[in-house]
């Protein structure tokens, strides 16, 4: 078994449908064809939940390299929360247990506040509905929902329908709509404290237009020409849903940028000049970490701890490694590959080759691939690295231009560079794994023949360049790449890596 491994990431080099849109298939790639005929290969899934994104969402380079280096699926916040609601593990979330137990034992009110829409950018109605269900399970009488209306990520008059949906859910679950206000006020992010004050006064002091029918109140606002984003404060006259000392507040937005300012005035900082004071004893829960500087707030879904990435694990075991790419993908083979860490590990060398200074890469489709290849071959021939990762950027960066002839030239350049790199690696006793992080050049045309500049949902290749004639490679996903590299290096996979070795 070889003890040296080369991981080659061909950015944007997916496995297409072999139609006209599949530039890789339709371009002469003699060396790639040789690899596919000679060595064991398989397919990796590189999009959707296989890389921790919402189902059906295209993969991207950041997420791809994060999963490749982590050796596990790294879930995005939204997906993590969705899964937790779906499999009911949210009920065992220690912060959820603490919030609702505290309210139950101390007879406190529970408040849910956040963007009440299906826009999917800042929040999810499903998460809100689940919170209402949990309140019902804990039998909490006073559960109040404070609705921030959208109209930016949704139709400007869709909010009335969302309030109807919420009220219908609350009727069979728990909770009452206590207040409504536009996101323009409640979710400012530009330090316009006079706007935030409108939301603060509504939530804390119950200042707003009194209404007995919240859906009707929304319609009246529309009739006056005021749509969702700008809805003025509305108070449910039938309940006292103001936030009081020692209450439980759950801010259910999972995106942080527009949740910070309201959190600041409720929990972090008195602003007497603006008439806003933090509320004593508030049990305040954020869906995700809103700001590392916030004190005394709870976090329902904390950031993933990506410990023991491939880079970290190799360094801890005294291995020498090289990470190399041109500028466009340098952050991907360093920062993202190492789980979001800027600083190199011990014995980790990095080579950055400048990308060409052109307006768009169709003007130079080979980019800096040949320069990367030359530096890489020289490094391979030094024979001092146990592990090397390289990214060839062309398939993705030229793929994004949508210019077919340029993508063809990019594919030709990559094929030539793969040849020189792999032949050098074989001569020095390296085994290689060749993959992509996601597709792009494999799907360059839409069905109507217009250029497609986006990534594709296609699987990506996994080629195992080895002397072992018996070897086979199983299908998998990007999270399986790091365990496979460790297998080549004859190293035991750390517990944190939940991916699988694909070499059989």
From Swiss-Prot:
Molecular function GO labels: manganese ion binding; phosphoglycerate mutase activity
Membrane-spanning ranges: none
GO CC annotations, alphabetized: cytosol
Enzyme Commission code: 5.4.2.12
One BP annotation, GO: glycolytic process
Reactions mediated catalytically: (2R)-2-phosphoglycerate = (2R)-3-phosphoglycerate
SS bonds (residue pairs): none
Co-factor: note: Binds 2 manganese ions per subunit.
Residue numbers annotated as active site: 61 (phosphoserine intermediate)
Pathway: Carbohydrate degradation; glycolysis; pyruvate from D-glyceraldehyde 3-phosphate: step 3/5
Residues binding Mn(2+) 1: 396, 400, 455
Binding site for substrate: 122, 152-153, 183, 189, 255-258, 329
InterPro entries for this protein: Alkaline_phosphatase_core_sf, BPG-indep_PGM_N, Metalloenzyme, PGAM_B_sf, Pgm_bpd_ind
Gene3D superfamilies: Alkaline Phosphatase, subunit A (3.40.720.10), BPG-independent phosphoglycerate mutase, domain B (3.40.1450.10)
Keyword terms: Glycolysis, Isomerase, Manganese, Metal-binding
Cofactor(s) the record lists: Mn(2+)
Domain of life: Bacteria
Residue positions binding Mn(2+) 2: 11, 61, 437-438
Role this protein plays: Catalyzes the interconversion of 2-phosphoglycerate and 3-phosphoglycerate.
Assembly with partners or alone: Monomer.
HAMAP family in UniProt: GpmI (MF_01038)
Family assignment from sequence similarity: Belongs to the BPG-independent phosphoglycerate mutase family.
Descriptive protein name: 2,3-bisphosphoglycerate-independent phosphoglycerate mutase
